[in-house]
């Protein structure tokens, strides 16, 4: 055991980190509420903002005191990065052997996801992130395609995203997410409401992520980088299907439910 490990474990168990996580979850919830709202607006014919994290930040920045709000969201997301990094280094002590390693790797991967969102928020707050979106995913896909076996790398990324989305659907269907709420947060009418928000939200977010993965996989299989895209492109694709607006409104409302569940989790946090 290194000298830093006891200190790291103490920080991982601290009330201060609990407060940081709560702040971060509120920020994460705000992002999902905005994405859900933009998805519904897209279904209703408003294409002024992308239904993505970047579009959500841009929409928030346009509100009164918007720049301050986006900076606040960015700080919250960086706090989530810090939490997951600490968890990856010192957490999951109740698990043993390979299971502990797996859980710490998952925590590290989540830190990367939160970091990407935090950087997006920082760019928008600094005035440099209003564009991009799906075109950036297409550019990244094109660069990957140029690598040896790049076509299969892109397809593998797509399959990984599908798997990630599937994990959200599974957690929603089985109510596995309930373990992140303290007992009080699962009891009574309010607890039932929180669980319903979590179930709908996890399934909707999982389906949206899976659709992003399908686009990446299709781009890899067909060797067409333009077929890939981020969340906005995935929702645009859904919109073009039969009954697309109805399905998109349902997905948008579900993603908003995930945002509300993040607020509930912040209130009744059980790490």
Residue spans for each PLM region:
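C-terminal functional regions that serve as terminal interaction/effector modules
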Residues: 2-8, 19, 29-38, 71, ...
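An N-terminus-focused feature that recognizes amino-terminal "leader" regions
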Residues: 2-78, 99, 266
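Cytoplasmic juxtamembrane regions at transmembrane-helix boundaries
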Residues: 3, 87-109, 172-197, 266-271
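Membrane-interface helix-boundary signature
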Residues: 11-27, 63-69, 96-106, 147-153, ...
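Hydrophobic, ordered structural segments
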Residues: 15-16, 34, 38, 64-175, ...
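Membrane-helix interface motif
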Residues: 39-51, 121-138, 217-228
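Short, membrane-exposed interhelical loops at transmembrane-helix boundaries
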Residues: 51-61, 140-144, 187-190, 194, ...
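Hydrophobic alpha-helical transmembrane segments of integral membrane proteins
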Residues: 105-124, 190-212
């Amino acid at each position: 055991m290194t000298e830093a490990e006891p200190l790291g474990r103490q920080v991982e168990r601290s009330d201060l980190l609990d407060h940081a996580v709560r702040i971060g979850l509120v920020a994460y919830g705000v992002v999902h509420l905005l994405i859900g709202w933009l998805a519904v607006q897209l279904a209703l014919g408003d294409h002024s903002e992308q239904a993505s994290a970047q579009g959500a930040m841009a929409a928030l920045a346009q509100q009164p005191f918007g720049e301050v709000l986006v900076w606040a969201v960015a700080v919250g997301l960086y706090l989530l990065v810090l939490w997951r990094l600490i968890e990856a280094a010192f957490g999951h002590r109740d698990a043993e052997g390979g299971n502990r390693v797996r859980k710490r790797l998952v925590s590290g991967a989540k830190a990367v996801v939160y970091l990407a969102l935090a950087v997006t928020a920082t760019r928008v707050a600094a005035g440099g992130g209003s564009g991009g979106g799906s075109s950036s995913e297409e550019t990244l896909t094109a660069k990957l395609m140029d690598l040896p076996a790049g076509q299969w790398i892109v397809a593998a990324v797509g399959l990984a995203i599908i798997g990630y989305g599937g994990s959200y659907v599974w957690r929603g269907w089985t109510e596995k997410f309930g373990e992140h709420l303290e007992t009080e947060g699962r009891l009574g009418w309010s607890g039932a409401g929180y669980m319903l928000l979590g179930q709908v939200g996890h399934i909707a977010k999982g389906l949206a992520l899976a659709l992003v993965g399908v686009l990446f996989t299709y781009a890899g299989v067909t060797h067409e980088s333009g077929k890939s895209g981020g969340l906005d492109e995935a929702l645009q694709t859904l919109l073009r299907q039969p009954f697309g607006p109805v399905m998109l409104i349902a997905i948008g409302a579900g993603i908003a439910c995930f945002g509300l569940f993040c607020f509930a989790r912040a209130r009744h946090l059980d790490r």
